[in-house]
């Protein structure tokens, strides 16, 4: 639970511990990563910023030049938007019960693992007269989630025909 902020420090308190997170160090690390890699940076702030406070960590990352923010669950992305965190946010572990309409309304990118999710998101985007930004999760062999290798050709051939997604 974020308790407050003192300068470049975020104070996060739980029942058993208090963390003082040096946000300037996070900003420095993002800047070094961005300069060294020379490519866009997606800062992962899932799980409440790994227990460091998702909102202050996300804002520090954006301040340092992170191009994207990534979270596991849609409710985490919604929390960031509700705290006015700007820029692209990707939520990659979606559930059938998630409110995809709210995600579209809040300009959140979504990762899909099935044609059913893709079709639902497409229909919602069409009703809003916008294009949903979709990322396709591919099962790379761990059998955890994603479109299976055997289904990729079929998935992408159908993806190309679906309106209101990019």
Q: What residues fall within each predicted segment?
A:
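Short, Lys/Arg-enriched N-terminal segments with co-localized hydrophobic residues
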Residues: 1-8
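Conserved PLP-enzyme active-site core in the AAT-like
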Residues: 36
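Active-site-proximal beta-alpha core segment in soluble small-molecule metabolic enzymes
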Residues: 10-13, 17-20, 25-27, 39-166
């Amino acid at each position: 639970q974020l308790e407050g902020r003192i300068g470049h420090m975020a104070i996060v308190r739980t029942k058993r511990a208090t963390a003082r997170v040096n946000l300037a160090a996070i900003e420095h690390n993002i800047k070094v990563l961005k300069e060294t890699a020379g490519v866009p940076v997606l800062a992962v702030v899932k799980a409440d910023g790994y227990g460091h406070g998702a909102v202050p960590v996300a804002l520090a990352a954006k301040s340092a030049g992170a191009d994207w923010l990534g979270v596991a669950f849609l409710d985490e992305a919604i929390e960031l938007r509700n705290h006015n965190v700007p820029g692209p946010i990707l939520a990659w572990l979606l559930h059938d019960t998630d409110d995809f309409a709210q995600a579209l309304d809040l300009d959140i990118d979504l990762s899909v693992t099935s044609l059913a999710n893709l079709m639902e998101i497409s229909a919602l985007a069409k009703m809003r007269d916008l294009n949903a930004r979709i990322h396709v999760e591919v099962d790379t062999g761990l059998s955890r989630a994603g479109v299976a290798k055997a289904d990729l050709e079929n998935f992408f051939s159908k993806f190309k025909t679906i309106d209101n997604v990019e």
